[in-house]
């Protein structure tokens, strides 16, 4: 089943969190001159038009990137993220396009770096391929993203980031994430892994945490932003990133900017944030 289309949700509060974390990890990895490998398992199309029927139908971006777009008090890290989105809008004042994870990464990768973007959705993949055809160091494939950890790791660079952000349409995605991490870590224990997760039902989210704890892998950091308290009602109340082998700067960077993000993205006052170790060093 491949019904999920990210265009309905592009630029929402979950994307803001995910893409700031992604940016900070890649910035920190790029402090070393040596090239790195970036794998994006569920790439989507890479770029989204916010005037599309899908985006306009939900309007989710208005409560995400839309709440940061014209702010003049952005913390330094958040300002760098907004600048990446402004580049995609040709520096204009109007917010017309939003970057998916692949486009965020493409703006940060250097000539010595390499990326693989995978997407299985038959409507999304041709758009993804077209959006990245000019990037010589980026490869796109219409393949199962979970399987790429086993197929492509370890990378020749021996440095890199794997982003796993499935739609969680199917309940087994929660288990497939853990299995993919096990396969990847077995081959590439020094790599950084970032897993995006939604909080729709808290017990589903805990399956990922418990599954990762059971692997015996160390250095697992959880970063979460909630827009309202957990609920049995339908809808996503929070989202987060689990980062394995995070750059040492990441924990403090997120602790410093999450109070601002929570206050700005959730002005109603129902938001909260968490940065904590699921498994320490």
Located regions from the model:
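Class I S-adenosyl-L-methionine-dependent methyltransferase catalytic core
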Residues: 1-281
């Amino acid at each position: 089943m491949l019904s999920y289309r990210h265009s309905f949700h592009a630029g929402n509060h979950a994307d803001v969190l995910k893409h700031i974390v992604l940016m900070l990890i890649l910035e920190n990895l790029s402090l070393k001159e040596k090239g790195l490998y970036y794998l994006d398992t569920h790439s989507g199309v890479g770029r989204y038009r916010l005037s599309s029927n899908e985006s306009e139908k939900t309007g989710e971006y208005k409560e995400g990137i839309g709440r940061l777009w014209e702010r003049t008090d952005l913390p330094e890290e958040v300002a760098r993220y907004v600048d990446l989105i402004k580049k995609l809008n040709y520096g204009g004042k109007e917010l017309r396009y939003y970057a998916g994870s692949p486009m965020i990464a493409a703006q940060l990768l250097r000539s010595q770096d390499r990326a693989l973007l995978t997407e299985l959705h038959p409507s999304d993949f041709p758009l993804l391929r077209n959006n990245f055809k000019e990037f010589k160091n980026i490869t796109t494939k219409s393949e199962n993203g979970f399987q790429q950890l086993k197929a492509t790791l370890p990378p020749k660079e021996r440095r890199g980031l794997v982003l796993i952000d499935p739609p969680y349409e199917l309940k087994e995605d929660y288990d497939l994430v853990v299995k993919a991490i096990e396969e990847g870590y077995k081959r590439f224990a020094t790599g950084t892994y970032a897993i995006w997760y939604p909080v729709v039902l808290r017990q589903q989210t805990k399956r990922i945490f418990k599954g990762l704890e059971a692997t015996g892998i160390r250095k697992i950091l959880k970063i979460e932003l909630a827009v309202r308290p957990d609920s049995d009602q339908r809808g996503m109340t929070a989202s987060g990133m689990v980062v394995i082998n995070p750059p040492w700067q990441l924990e403090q960077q997120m602790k410093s900017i999450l109070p601002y993000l929570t206050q700005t993205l959730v002005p109603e006052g129902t938001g909260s944030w968490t940065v904590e170790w699921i498994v320490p060093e």
